[in-house]
Structure formats: C-alpha cells, structure tokens
C-alpha cells in the first residue's frame, strides 16, 4: 500500500481503494494494507449490490467478450488471493471463512438502518432465507457478524474518505 501511495503521489494521482461496505463491516481487510487508500470508492456499497450491478451490466451489455469476463467474475468465489493458485484452484474462499455475504449484508442493513436487535434480525433472516439456509447456519453467521462487526471497529475508525451511496454506511465521519 505504501508503494502504491508513493507512486500515486509521484504521478499527482490518488490511490483508489476497492474495499466495499461488507468487507469494512466485517473487518475483512489487512490493517494498513488493502484497508488503506486515499479514497474508498466502494465504502458504502455492499458486496451483494456490487454483484447485482455486475450481473445487470453483463445481462445488458452488447459486448460479448465483456459479458463473458463479467460472468466469469461472478462465477469466481470471493477471495483475498492475489496470485493464481499453483493447482488451478482457489485455496482461500472468503465466504467459507466469514460466511455468505448475502446474510451479512442483510444483518448489516437491519442492524444499522432499521436498528433491530439481534433476535429480530435472526427471525427475519430465518423467514427471508427459508429454503436457502437452515436456522443453525443463519444463527452461526449472525454470531460471527456481531463478533466481527464490533471486534473490527478499530479498522473503521481510520478509514479513508469515500462517498455515501445508500442509506447505510460505517464511516466514522
């Protein structure tokens, strides 16, 4: 990150961060690594919205090659790995470690925007995701969400500036 910032300063440009609201809420970033930039363009955009936007553009794009690339991105598991794996498979899949982002984004919205207690969020999640996740899985990832959200606050206390796109954000400003 420091090398990228130095390079940006030499060019008179800025280092734009790609971390999204979901990653910031869970603290799923390396402190002063990918967590730091000069402007966090996706800081208030949840990962599930990013996926929907990419899907929409892939479905409406007239460029077949770009559509193919976008669909490949959507089919690739979320991972912090930066280099191609040696055996051709991604070893570290983020959602295997922290849980499904669609659940975390749901929890985040109802905690921050609606101000609901964990018990109510759990009940709503059980109804909303019935048939997709069992109650034990929903509860497991809800506990993980709350633990990570509060344990990782220190990373959000020093975030770079970024836009507020929707009604939910975790910026300390």
Residues covered by each model-derived region:
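ATP/NTP-dependent adenylation/nucleotidyl-transfer catalytic domains that generate, transfer
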Residues: 1-173
